[in-house]
Amino acid sequence: MKNLNLLSILLFASIAFVSCDNSANQNQFTLLSSNDTGVDFTNQLNEDNEINYFTYPYIYMGGGVSVGDINNDDLDDIFFTGNMTKNRLYLNKGNLKFDDITDSSDSGGDDRWYTGSTMIDIN
């Protein structure tokens, strides 16, 4: 019985070792510039004596992002929330090209601190 357990462990270790292969080291993602995509959002944080980690510990929690189809064209649109910058809504035009429709959709928000986002498609 002891030999069977040892044999099982050796067999499992051999299979795990043989199945590891680094020869197919291919990139799964490609970095695209904002000039190519039209998505240019930065959640810029500016700390000072009034707003910093010690006075507001949630400062580094970040904003939020939602992805959904807002105009029923079967393309995923992107909504970013900002902490110290206005929110941004990007309409997907296809082929990873987006238009900033924040102003025309009145989705920039106000001076509040936005930290999350959700999106739902009812229809």
What residue ranges belong to the model's regions?
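Bacterial N-terminal signal peptides
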Residues: 8-16
